[in-house]
From Swiss-Prot:
Organism: Arabidopsis thaliana (Mouse-ear cress)
Further information: The stability of ACS proteins, and the regulation of such stability, play a central role in ethylene biosynthesis.
InterPro entries cross-referenced by the UniProt entry: Aminotransferase_I/II_large, Ethylene_sulfur-biosynth, NHTrfase_class1_PyrdxlP-BS, PyrdxlP-dep_Trfase, PyrdxlP-dep_Trfase_major, PyrdxlP-dep_Trfase_small
Induction and repression of expression: By indole-3-acetic acid (IAA) and cycloheximide (CHX).
UniProt protein name: 1-aminocyclopropane-1-carboxylate synthase 8
Gene name of the encoded protein: ACS8
Pfam family, one: Aminotran_1_2
Pathway(s) served: Alkene biosynthesis; ethylene biosynthesis via S-adenosyl-L-methionine; ethylene from S-adenosyl-L-methionine: step 1/2
Amino acid sequence: MGLLSKKASCNTHGQDSSYFWGWEEYEKNPYDEIKNPDGIIQMGLAENQLSFDLIESWLAKNPDAANFQREGQSIFRELALFQDYHGLPSFKNAMADFMSENRGNRVSFNPNKLVLTAGATPANETLMFCLADPGDAFLLPTPYYPGFDRDLKWRTGAEIVPIQCKSANGFRITKVALEEAYEQAQKLNLKVKGVLITNPSNPLGTTTTRTELNHLLDFISRKKIHLISDEIYSGTVFTNPGFISVMEVLKDRKLENTDVFDRVHIVYSLSKDLGLPGFRVGVIYSNDDFVVSAATKMSSFGLISSQTQYLLSALLSDKTFTKNYLEENQIRLKNRHKKLVSGLEAAGIECLKSNAGLFCWVDMRHLLKSNTFEAEIELWKKIVYEVKLNISPGSSCHCNEPGWFRVCFANLSEETLKVALDRLKRFVDGPSPTRRSQSEHQRLKNLRKMKVSNWVFRLSFHDREPEER
């Protein structure tokens, strides 16, 4: 260890949480309907597998894009050599158009202000490098995505100060909570450089309201700080209220040519809306030319392959496909969400009312032995090791109330979801009085048998004892 850098040998990587531990346990014993039916079911993975068939169908109908051809001629060599280092113009244009379409075409995006990154993770980290120095802080509303402890802090040296949101108002962001977080940062001698939100929220599965967005814009205006809006779930909104991008609020308030406009930055990717996390496609959109320039230089450390850009530029440019995909995907998400909520209700478990995302924020406070985070982790361990479901405890999301859990629903089949819900219901119900009675009766019966057998054995032993001597 002495030969390694402090960065490599430190334990500030943010992965020492129950969120990542649950993944490790799942990987040791993954559920498989045939090969391992008693394994752990993965419900801690926010992955959208519900509409993969739509993309596969498009690929089958568009062999040129899938096979890296143009008018039937291979362009593999062209794509394999150096292209525009920071993005194919065709892909940037297609991405900007898709982002606008995804927001109801109520706002438009300039492709020249897009910075391409290998996913949303480096997009968020790059913005931290651009906006904060080591020791500076960003305010994040709780609960928040557990990976931010790694993504925002580890390499950048930035700090996170939580904006404490409460279940009493559905974990909404309030003026008071914003001010309290800012004051807390000052008490810690941390310079606040901005606020980062996920809209729709991960892990809540709710869209940020116009009122909240106005509070945030007023707040960053007063404090002269930045706002990062991570909008990677914007296409997963499956019921009202609809998604409102912060860009739409800026436009409605006619703030386009103000300093506030330049301090608002968007993060987007295709990992959630299109279910393509393996393609590693992320975007930074900023109104600040200096941020765009700096982020573009930094993006050299995590580029998107030319092959990926070529394929996706063709897919995103097919407006018939994108329109159908977004509509059908939302229908499927709504149906799957309904199945999860119904199954949880059958087990006596409620969820925060949600309208977006690939997960539910599940209320298991009534199952805790005590109102403590220790009790929450104890319950979580039972669910992982006994029920064999990997879900994410609220404490890993920095929720300030024990007993909440994030449960994902779009990464598994309907049949596997049913198995998971059946397991959870059996766990919550516990042994029924009838089963307990039968079990106790069987235990006493076995005990009597054992006593009789022991008595017979002893009797037989004493009868034989003289002979054996």
